[in-house]
C-alpha cells in the first residue's frame, strides 16, 4: 500500500523543505500537495528539491483556474527537476469557488475535465515529439507551439502521470477511463462508501473497455495520537472541518449513505444565519467515528487494514504534530506496508 503524507496547507513556505525531508525519513512514499493558500507547484518544487526518493503529487491542483498548457509546463519542469518523482493530480473544486473566488468559467465539469486531461496529454506529446500536437474541442484550442517555446527534453525521465480527485460517480468514471489514478476526498473516503459507490464505478468502467483498473488513494481525515489531551483537540479540529465540508451539497452522498441525510441542510442553514461558531457540535460522534480514522500508534496498522485493506491502493496520513513521535510513526508505516 502506498503511504502518502498530507501537509498543512498553511505551512510556511520556508518550512516545506524540512517537512519533506522529515516525511521521507519516516518512510512515506509520497507527499500530497493541496491547492488552498499556496501555489501547489511552488510547494511541490520546494519539496522535490529537498528530497531524493520522496514522490510528490499535487493532491489536488485546481484544473479550471489555469490553462492546461500552464499545468503541463509546470508538471514537465517538476518531472525534470526531480528525475521523474512528480505526478500531476487535478481536481475541479465547486462552481462557486471557481467562478467567484477565481473569476474563471465553470460549466459541464466532467466534460471540461475530460478535455483538460486530454489537452495536458497533448502538451506532453508535443514536448516529446518536439512539435505541436494540436488539440481542439469545445473548451480548448491548442494549435500553436513554436520551437522557441518548447521546453527542454527530459530524456529517459518518466512523463508525469495524471491523477484525478473525484467525488461523484461521473467524475470517478472519467478517472477510471482516462487517468492514471484516483484520489478520494475526505468526505467520500469512508470504507463503506468506497465499497458501494466508488470501487463499483471503477470496475464498471474497466468492464466497459478500459484495459486495467487504476490505483485508488483514499484520503480520510485522521486523528492519530497516544495523548488523550491532543486527541481531544484534534477531534474538535476535525469536527470543525467536517462541519465546513458537509455544508457543501456536492459532498452530501456520504452523509446520505451513512444515514445522516438531514445534516447537510442543518449545517447550511447555520451558515445562512451566520451561526457557525459552534457548528462543529452538529457533527455526531457516531458519524465522526465512522468517517475519521482515529487510532493510537499501536493500533494504527490494524485500523488501516480493517477499514481499507484490499479496498484501496494507498492512504494519506498526517505525521505526528510532535516530532518526538516520528520513530513510533515510522514503525506504524512499516507495519502497514507489511500487512497490506
Feature-to-residue mapping (PLM):
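C-terminal amphipathic alpha-helical "assembly" element
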Residues: 1-28, 79, 87, 121, ...
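N-terminal beta1-alpha1-beta2 module of alpha/beta enzyme domains
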Residues: 1-58, 64, 159-160
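Internal, glycine-rich beta/alpha segment that forms the wall or movable "lid"
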Residues: 75, 80-86, 90-181, 185-214, ...
